[in-house]
């Protein structure tokens, strides 16, 4: 018996694994214990899930984004992200918080006060957005959007700097972002982000202004009198405008070449002097003609008045027609003659001054 016992001990020492597996196969503990009765989750997680389901039934959603840090508002104003989105503060760094389930009265009073001033204060800032499947199922429904919108320029609304991205929202028409990518493929607003940005608006406005300026003005908008005066007026009005010199591209002007600005100013001055002399001569010669015309018109008026004394209205009309017709015809003939004389004098003076300038330039060129 002692020999058998010693042989069993030696066997266990030599091959322990074999004996262990045989014991596990024979052991009734593992056969009788069912695996389904083992708890898969700790009891803390169950309580948390049950509390979460209760809060969802009551209408209070759990907060998933970054908590607030209010210190003086007691989390009862729209400055607080939790209160503005209709969420109870959980795991926030706020001080003296009233936005919780313990102080529901103060929270409801603050919400009533805010809704009295702005009925859409909380509906426009509701957290959460629709998924692609929800958008396909109901394409007419829009997700909760921020009322003021973001103003991102470089992040493309894909970082936490963007208010919409931080709140898990899609960018809306109110946003003024550029190159935005915070948009779902199923739902895209008609006029979106970059289209309403100030830079694009300025470009569109400048393009419209250039097109409007490039279009010629319609003829009916310009009165006929202004066109006739502009065409019939002599060149005497041009010298009054100041001439502005332009610098050369190289930064200096050559001493040999004549300056175009000085040459133009000389020609304009010559034409102005010619117009003044021609107008003075016309005034001197037209004085006796004017007197004769006035006498003739007075005689014709007196004859018409004596003949048509019975009808006063007709008399006035006839006098006006005759007087205006004679005056217009005389003025037209005089103005046409005077204008031709003025143009001839201007041309002569300009050509003479230009000839003198060319002679001086040729002499200076030959001397150099």
UniProtKB/Swiss-Prot annotation:
Chain ranges of the CRC domain: 64-185
MF GO annotations: cis-regulatory region sequence-specific DNA binding; DNA-binding transcription factor activity; metal ion binding
Keywords on record: Developmental protein, Metal-binding, Nucleus, Zinc
GO cellular component, one term: nucleus
Membrane-spanning residues: none
SMART domains named in the record: CXC (SM01114)
Localization per Swiss-Prot or TrEMBL: Nucleus
PROSITE patterns from the UniProt entry: CRC
First and last residue of the signal peptide: none
General function of this protein: Plays a role in development of both male and female reproductive tissues.
Domain notes: The cysteine-rich domain CRC binds zinc in vitro.
Entry similarity comment: Belongs to the lin-54 family.
Name by which UniProt lists this protein: Protein tesmin/TSO1-like CXC 8
Originating species: Arabidopsis thaliana (Mouse-ear cress)
Taxonomic lineage: Eukaryota, Viridiplantae, Streptophyta, Embryophyta, Tracheophyta
């Amino acid at each position: 018996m002692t020999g058998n016992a010693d042989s069993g001990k030696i066997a266990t020492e030599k091959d322990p694994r074999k004996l262990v597996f045989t014991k596990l196969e024979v052991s009734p503990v593992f056969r009788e214990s069912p695996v389904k009765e083992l708890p898969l989750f700790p009891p803390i997680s169950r309580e948390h899930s049950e509390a979460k389901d209760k809060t969802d039934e009551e209408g209070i959603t759990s907060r998933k984004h970054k908590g607030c840090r209010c210190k003086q508002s007691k989390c009862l104003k729209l400055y607080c992200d939790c209160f503005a989105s209709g969420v109870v503060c959980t795991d926030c760094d706020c001080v003296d918080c009233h936005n919780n389930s313990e102080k529901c009265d103060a929270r409801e009073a603050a919400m009533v006060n805010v809704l009295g001033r702005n009925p859409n204060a909380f509906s426009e800032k509701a957290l959460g957005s629709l998924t692609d499947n929800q958008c396909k199922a109901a394409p007419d429904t829009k997700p909760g959007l921020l009322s003021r919108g973001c103003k991102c320029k470089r992040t493309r609304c894909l970082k936490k700097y963007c208010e919409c991205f931080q709140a898990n929202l899609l960018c809306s028409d109110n946003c003024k972002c550029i190159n935005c990518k915070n948009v779902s493929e199923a739902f895209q607003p008609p006029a979106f982000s970059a289209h309403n940005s100030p830079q694009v608006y300025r470009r569109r406005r400048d393009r419209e202004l250039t097109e409007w300026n490039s279009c010629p003005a319609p003829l009916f908008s310009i009165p006929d009198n202004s066109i006739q005066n502009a065409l019939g007026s002599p060149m005497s009005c041009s010298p009054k405008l100041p001439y502005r010199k332009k610098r050369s591209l190289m930064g200096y002007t050559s001493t040999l070449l004549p300056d175009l600005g000085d040459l133009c100013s000389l020609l304009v001055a010559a034409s102005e002097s010619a117009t003044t002399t021609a107008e003075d001569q016309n005034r001197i010669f037209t004085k006796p003609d004017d007197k004769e015309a006035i006498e003739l018109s007075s005689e014709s008026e007196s004859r018409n008045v004596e003949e048509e004394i019975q009808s006063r209205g007709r008399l006035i009309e006839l006098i006006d027609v005759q007087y205006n017709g004679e005056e217009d015809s005389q003025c037209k003939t005089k103005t046409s003659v005077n204008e031709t004389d003025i143009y001839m004098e201007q041309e002569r003076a300009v050509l003479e001054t230009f000839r003198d300038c060319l002679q001086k330039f040729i002499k200076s060129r030959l001397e150099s």
